[in-house]
Amino acid sequence: MVYGAKRNPDRCPTHPGALLREDVIPATGKTKAEIAQLLGISRQHLYDILRERKPVSPAVAVRLGKLFGDGAGVWVRMQAAYDTWHAEREEDVSGIPTLHPKAAYERPET
């Protein structure tokens, strides 16, 4: 991984299911059903993640992190980036003002 590289903000981040489907699971030599069993989740749940129909929940991220040895944070951050990118394009925030950052974080004097 290249640190400090800027990604194109117009490109949707990869759904963790796509990474699992295209790279991670094939590299194990195991079937999707075997991976689901090892994770302790249903095949349907795993298939929904792989088809990008369901997000990787924190609970599943913990299981993935243990199984693949990379920790839950990788999967949680990947899902958060994907979800945030979509939310920023779907949510209408035009009626919400932007406060000066200092004012937003200062406590009022008492």
Residue ranges and their predicted role:
Residues 5-30:
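A short, Lys/Arg-rich alpha-helix, primarily the initiator
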Residues 29-48:
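Short alpha-helical DNA-recognition segment
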